[in-house]
Curated annotation (Swiss-Prot):
High-level lineage: Bacteria, Bacillati, Bacillota, Bacilli, Bacillales
Residue numbers binding putrescine: 271-274
Highest taxon, organism lineage: Bacteria
Name of the featured protein: Putrescine carbamoyltransferase
UniProt binding sites for carbamoyl phosphate: 54-58, 105, 132
Reaction catalyzed: carbamoyl phosphate + putrescine = N-carbamoylputrescine + phosphate + H(+)
């Protein structure tokens, strides 16, 4: 049996492994668009733990499991005892006997870490207060689909505009893993922490990428191939009132037509959604031909399929045809003999 692996943070995977996941996702997307649904996860069950409500994450995982022949169970907030009457570890141990893989969207990053450390099955981080690795993978797939003509991913520059959200941190992790140039254009007090920058630095040593944090719009946007933004509330600052939030970010950090004009002519706009129209991005940009936000949303599904197959298929393969034939025959005999009971 292969050693169990989890998808908690992309720092746990090499660039080559990430590229392999991307290739799996793109190949299955192509297959499904051509009408063939590979039944790679037949009879497998995904348990989905949600401490936060979600649209894209839940629908993407459920659809992915159905398309690949499996089944997903939604464990809603308040429906399970996660860290309450029952410890996180006990929940992980029990669910390990009932489902084949777990996905958890949690309030605290330590919760998904504890689930992974205790569960006997793979655990996927569906988002925490630290990072959003499934979004990272979907965004990487989207960037590969929209590479500027004549450029490789390593030649590209991505600029994250605004607050240091989980998605901002994850965008930097993925960009520097792939060898891209990453810039956060955001105000002091709302920039990525030193702990995030250390991971980016280690990634860059291997990949040849770069990272920069700046408040200078011209430096940030120069030659940008991709511009990304997220809502204006981030990883670690105290909750701001709407008035304080607008005063901090508006208008300098709003992605509008003027800001877009400072980037490369072929620039693409990205947003993880949901977006607050008129705040971090204008309608004009969000709905523009260069906006790829709906492609991003679709590629959440592409990423989920890739992750589920990457982490579960080795266990499926290990069973082998001989094992399947053995148990099919034994079950058929048992049921035949017991038919008269």
């Amino acid at each position: 049996m292969n050693k169990k692996r989890d998808f908690i943070d992309t720092k746990d995977f090499s660039k080559e492994e990430i590229l392999f996941m991307i290739e799996i996702g793109r190949k299955m997307k192509e297959s499904i668009k051509n009408g063939h649904y590979p039944q790679l996860l037949k009879h497998k069950t995904l348990g989905m733990i949600f401490e936060q409500s979600s649209t894209r994450t839940r629908v993407s995982f459920e659809t992915a499991m159905t398309q690949l022949g499996g089944h997903a169970q939604y464990l809603a907030p308040g429906q399970i005892q996660l860290g309450g009457h029952e410890s996180v570890g006990d929940t992980a141990k029990v669910l390990s006997r009932l489902v084949d893989i777990l996905m958890a969207r949690v309030e605290r990053h330590q919760t998904v870490v504890e689930l992974a450390n205790t569960a006997a099955i793979p655990v996927i981080n569906g988002m925490s207060d630290y990072n959003h690795p499934t979004q990272e993978l979907g965004d990487a797939i989207t960037m590969f689909e929209h590479l500027p003509k004549g450029k490789k991913i390593e030649d590209c520059k991505i600029v994250f505009v605004g607050d240091a959200t989980q998605v901002c941190a994850s965008t930097m992790f993925m960009a520097t893993k792939l060898g891209m140039d990453f810039v956060q254009f955001g105000p002091k007090g709302f920039q990525l922490r030193e702990e995030h920058l250390k991971i980016a630095e280690e990634n860059c040593k291997v990949s040849g990428g770069s990272y920069l944090i700046t408040e200078d719009v011209d430096i940030a946007l120069k030659d940008a191939d991709f511009i990304y933004t997220d809502v204006w509330y981030g990883l670690y600052e105290a909750e701001l009132s709407e008035e304080e939030r607008m005063k901090t970010f508006y208008p300098k950090y709003q992605v509008n037509k003027e800001l877009i004009s400072k980037a490369a002519p072929h620039v693409k706009f990205m947003h993880c959604l949901p977006a607050t129209r008129g705040e971090e991005v204008t309608d004009e940009v969000l709905d523009a031909p260069y906006s790829v936000v709906i492609d991003e949303a679709e590629n959440r599904l592409t990423a989920m399929r890739a992750l589920l197959v990457y982490f579960m298929n080795p266990y499926v393969r290990e069973a082998g045809f001989a094992v399947a034939e053995k148990y099919d025959a034994e079950l058929e005999l048992l049921l035949r003999n017991g038919a008269g009971l």
